[in-house]
Amino acid sequence: MSAPKANDAGFLTQELTILNKSGIHARPAAMFVKTANRFTGDIFVEKDGEKINGKSIMGLMMLAAGPGSKVTVLAKGSDADAAIAELEALVNRKFDED
């Protein structure tokens, strides 16, 4: 795990690899959104140049992030560090699937 980096727009960013066997389908998307919604700041997820609201189940599913996909989580706000840490932990533990 590397430390999040700040981009020019003031967002903390962290690249993550999707590790679970099925990628981000409905259940992992719901878990991601439930976690993201605990934070007050803005959270986005980017894959292959497409950026979606990280608090949207449909948006996450539309990214079609399969196993091994690289996604970037962007967070901004007073709790951005904590948001990225918790979302990274969720992804790294394979959404509790495997």
Annotate each PLM feature.
Residues A9-N20:
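Short amphipathic
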Residues S2-A3, T17, V73-L74:
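Intrinsic disorder
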Residues S2-A9, F95-D98:
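Short, charged, intrinsically disordered terminal tails
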Residues G66-D98:
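C-terminal structural segments of small proteins and small subunits
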Residues A26, A30-S78:
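Amphipathic, hydrophobic secondary-structure cores in small proteins
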Residues S2-A6, A30, K34, A82-E86:
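Long, contiguous binding/interaction regions
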